[in-house]
Amino acid sequence: SNQTGFLLQGDTPKEESANSGASWKVMRDEAYAPCATDMGSVLHTYMVVGPGDEIRGDRFPWGWEQKDFDDAGWQEAMQLNTPVVTAGYGTDNMWTLSPRSIPQMESRMQRLGIVRRESGIRTDAAFLSGLHPLTVPGHTKISLLLDQSFETVAYTVIRLSEGKNAEVKLTYAEALFDEHEQKGNRNEIAGKSIKGLYDIFYPDGQQNR
């Protein structure tokens, strides 16, 4: 497909009530915006990944999945043509879907490994295992270098409480850069800095976001 869309379709008649269609309602989530759009020039290389996400908690429709959520301001979904096109050219090939014939991708939780470097705060690895939160005092700037110790393909799940008007920036990289813009040994961090794709979160000040 060269344009985005969404289709939910059950395999049996039991799921028909949940199938996507004209009865669905939609809204544009204003909490999300692209960031890290200049990584090609920053890293002086060709980038083959999309931008990062800038997420503003005070614009997110919290509770949208709850039964009593007020969706009066949402619009009716626009139903497109058939999603299956066997052949065609031009506009008849904008939204093209076909059933997958291969297994689903692996999905499991991975927790980050260790804290390699810290600035502005003293911490331990217990918060990485989920045993207790990392508490950052107000009007404080901290920096943590977290090492997974192996390369992986994953997406970030972060839980935030309070911290209204704070900024949380997560930068991802396979290795650090030295003063000559070289990566070298991935295990070495002394005198090196991180450059890479990043996401930014702006908490709304509430609990367990």
Q: Model-derived features: where do they sit?
A:
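Extracellular/oxidizing-compartment recognition motifs
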Residues: 1-209
